């Protein structure tokens, strides 16, 4: 009897271990950077200012019909050293939430890394790439990070206003799908007024 319980315990432990491995490998793999365009002749001074997050897609983003994602805003403030102070303003738990970080210029114009990355436990790399923008209406930005040895990526569709044309949204969907994301990993946050209009 004790031997039978031991085998049962080992079998359950093995099943739990296999399940844990499955849950860490269920992320859609990040695409190679060769599949992610870079905005030519990126103009850092024109990109700064407030952007509304009109669309979001990523391997850790899932559409929630019962509790849809609320729109938030991100402000890029260009500093003298050509890095950006980046502040995202979100409405959470009935109050305004601010997330502040620094994006440091990378190898090419329009590409950035996260400044002071060591202050983010578990984060080993963080890349930002401006895919396309016309500066005064819309932008598409690709983010990739490695956290706790897991690779996450997302694409953000920014608008200078809360509404963008259906053509721009369709283009965003097409691009997200070209990077391997299915429809349920693509969301269009619900426009709100709280916190993001100040």
Curated annotation (Swiss-Prot):
UniProt-listed Pfam families: Lipocalin
Signal peptide: 1-20
Expressed in which tissues: Detected in neutrophils (at protein level). Expressed in bone marrow and in tissues that are prone to exposure to microorganism. High expression is found in bone marrow as well as in uterus, prostate, salivary gland, stomach, appendix, colon, trachea and lung. Expressed in the medullary tubules of the kidney. Not found in the small intestine or peripheral blood leukocytes.
Protein name as catalogued: Neutrophil gelatinase-associated lipocalin
Function: Iron-trafficking protein involved in multiple processes such as apoptosis, innate immunity and renal development. Binds iron through association with 2,3-dihydroxybenzoic acid (2,3-DHBA), a siderophore that shares structural similarities with bacterial enterobactin, and delivers or removes iron from the cell, depending on the context. Iron-bound form (holo-24p3) is internalized following binding to the SLC22A17 (24p3R) receptor, leading to release of iron and subsequent increase of intracellular iron concentration.
Record text on subunit structure and interactions: Monomer. Homodimer; disulfide-linked. Heterodimer; disulfide-linked with MMP9.
Taxonomic path: Eukaryota, Metazoa, Chordata, Craniata, Vertebrata
Induction: Expression is activated by the oncoprotein BCR-ABL; BCR-ABL misregulates expression via the JAK/STAT pathway and binding of STAT5A to the promoter. Induced by insulin.
An annotated Gene Ontology molecular function: identical protein binding
Annotated positions binding enterobactin: 126, 154
Residues with attached carbohydrate: 85
Disulphide bonds in the chain: 96-195
InterPro entries, per database record: Calycin (IPR012674), LCN2/LCN12 (IPR003087), Lipocalin (IPR002345), Lipocalin_CS (IPR022272), Lipocln_cytosolic_FA-bd_dom (IPR000566)
Residues holding a carboxymycobactin: 72-74, 145, 154, 158
Organism domain of life: Eukaryota
Residues with the Pyrrolidone carboxylic acid modification: 21
């Amino acid at each position: 009897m004790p031997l039978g319980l031991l085998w049962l315990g080992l079998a359950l432990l093995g099943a739990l271990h296999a399940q844990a491995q499955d849950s860490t490998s269920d992320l859609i793999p990040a695409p190679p950077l060769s599949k992610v365009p870079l905005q030519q002749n990126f103009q850092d001074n024109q990109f700064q200012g407030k952007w509304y997050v009109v669309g979001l897609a990523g391997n850790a983003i899932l559409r929630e019909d019962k509790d849809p994602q609320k729109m938030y805003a991100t402000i890029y403030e260009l500093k003298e050293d050509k890095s950006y102070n980046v502040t995202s303003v979100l409405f959470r738990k009935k109050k305004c939430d601010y997330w502040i970080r620094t994006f440091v210029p990378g190898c090419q114009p329009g590409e950035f890394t996260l400044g002071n990355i060591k202050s983010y436990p578990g984060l080993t790399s963080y890349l930002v790439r401006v895919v396309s923008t016309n500066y005064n209406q819309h932008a598409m930005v690709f983010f990739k990070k490695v956290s706790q040895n897991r690779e996450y990526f997302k694409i953000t569709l920014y608008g200078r206003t809360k509404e963008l044309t259906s053509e721009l949204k369709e283009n965003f969907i097409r691009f997200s799908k070209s990077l391997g994301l299915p429809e349920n990993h693509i969301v269009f946050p619900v426009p709100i007024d709280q916190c993001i209009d100040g």
